[in-house]
Amino acid sequence: MAPVNKSDKDRVIIFDTTLRDGEQCPGATMTFEEKLEVAELLDDMGVDVIEAGFPITSEGDFQAVSEIARRSKNAVIAGLSRAHPADIDRCAEAVKFAKRGRVHTVIATSPLHMRVKLNKTPEQVIETSVAMVARARNQIDDVEWSAEDGTRSEMDYLCRIVEAVIKAGATTVNIPDTVGYTVPEEYTHFMKTLIERVPNSDKAVFSVHCHNDLGMAVANSLAGVVGGARQVECTINGIGERAGNAALEEIVMAINVRNDKFPYWNKIDTTQLTRASKVVSAATSFPVQYNKAIVGRNAFAHESGIHQDGVLKDASTYEIMRPEMVGLKQSSLVLGKHSGRHAFVHKLEEMGYKLGPNQLEDAFTRMKALADRKKDIYDEDIEALVDEEMAASHDRIKLTSLTVIAGTHGPQRATMKLDVDGQIKIEEAEGNGPVDAVFNCIKRLVPHEAKLELYQVHAVTEGTDAQAEVSVRLSHDGRSMTARAADPDTLVASAKAYLGALNKIVMKRQRDTVTTAAAS
């Protein structure tokens, strides 16, 4: 655990970029409301800096960053900008209402990126960096500068440009391993050398931002801290471009559990890590792999008889941390068809949900209906039910009823009733199998050009009456949208998941139309 005598020099600032770098993961787009929910949770759990988005990219991103800034309580709210004047100004405008705002500007510094991507000389990159940091500092006190592809940059050049941007006013200097190329020992030496050679390095906080292309993002991040960095940039569940980013939960628990090797501390409330993982997974429709460290379903599961015997005698035989440390509670048979509202509300509060009266009533009704169809109600069932209810609250297309005729002979036929913007529509369709019939029915009811990229099914809990959780990814106009849904009936879950992804496409098209109209 964290040392008793805490000092600022040993504090590691946790910079979460789930809402920016994490959302750049293909198919992980979040709605405006989902971004606000994730940001509130990150703030509550003690994240120091929340990178809320990339304001210049769209009106939607600007509005999300601005609203998160307005609602912020304790965290610094950062926005990303390229090294362009318009980016800097737009970013500063987006975070200006935060209690503490930050402009985070980035430019490439490796020979390859400067030559191929930027088409700039090293001296031009220094000149641009200094000018943009100074421009940002004229508008805000907290400015972070990032050297994209930093670990493939030349050390002598990096020392010169870092010294220059600190002199221009950068308060944080971030050296990313943008393509996940470095290894721990190398990164420790790299950061240590850089900090020692930059004359004014004591005037800024040094930061690391590691990608997971070789599976070493967390190890490299910790190595960077050993080398002198005091800010770690990471995401919930490690989501991010390509192979992802360093996982926040793994960074934090590695420091806490192995404080003998990493004598540092942070402000994260670790009991909220599991909840944060589930909220982000629901918002992005990206399931967490079962064997994911810290927050995976099997992270604290023991099936081997030898392991079970050891854990029953003393949990420390096979557990290096207690499940309670990360907010994990074992599945329990608490709710059923005889449960009342009071017990249901208490269970939701215990699991960290805050629902409004209408959402609560809808969730309670669905729980009772599920209890009539399913013998045992587990925590995972409640989470799947409520997460789906919250995600569907803004949907324009809703499933009212579904009947499927399937068997060994004859075509498979689906009959579906949808509520489309308050109008009830009914249609029938055949298909090559029941799922195909269901999806063909949706296409008849809501004509669209989206292509099915992914269809996955897995059980939420065990048993023949377990809920099926279906993931569907649709692509449209070069964008991918993913949604998940759960139901004891796999076909119903399939229809809901498909409609969830379709609703995201409709919402995106609507937002783009509004943005275009506002710009004209």
Swiss-Prot record:
Q: Which PROSITE patterns does the UniProt entry name for this protein? A: AIPM_HOMOCIT_SYNTH_1, AIPM_HOMOCIT_SYNTH_2, PYR_CT
Q: Which GO terms describe its biological process?
A: L-leucine biosynthetic process
Gene Ontology terms for molecular function: 2-isopropylmalate synthase activity; acetyl-CoA C-acetyltransferase activity; manganese ion binding
Pyruvate carboxyltransferase domain segment(s):
12-274
Q: Where is this region: Regulatory domain?
A: 398-520
Principal localisation = cytoplasm
What Pfam families does this protein's entry cite? HCS_D2, HMGL-like, LeuA_dimer
| Cellular compartment(s) | Cytoplasm
Give the Enzyme Commission number: 2.3.3.13
**Reactions mediated catalytically:** 3-methyl-2-oxobutanoate + acetyl-CoA + H2O = (2S)-2-isopropylmalate + CoA + H(+)
Q: Which cofactors does it use?
A: Mn(2+)
The top EC class, named as a word, is transferase
Q: In which pathway does it act?
A: Amino-acid biosynthesis; L-leucine biosynthesis; L-leucine from 3-methyl-2-oxobutanoate: step 1/4
Q: Which UniProt keywords apply?
A: Amino-acid biosynthesis, Branched-chain amino acid biosynthesis, Cytoplasm, Leucine biosynthesis, Manganese, Metal-binding, Transferase
User: Whom does it interact with, and what assembly results?
Assistant: Homodimer.
The family classification in the record reads: Belongs to the alpha-IPM synthase/homocitrate synthase family. LeuA type 1 subfamily.
Q: What is this protein called?
A: 2-isopropylmalate synthase
**Source organism of this protein record:** Bradyrhizobium diazoefficiens (strain JCM 10833 / BCRC 13528 / IAM 13628 / NBRC 14792 / USDA 110)
- Point out the gene that encodes the protein: leuA
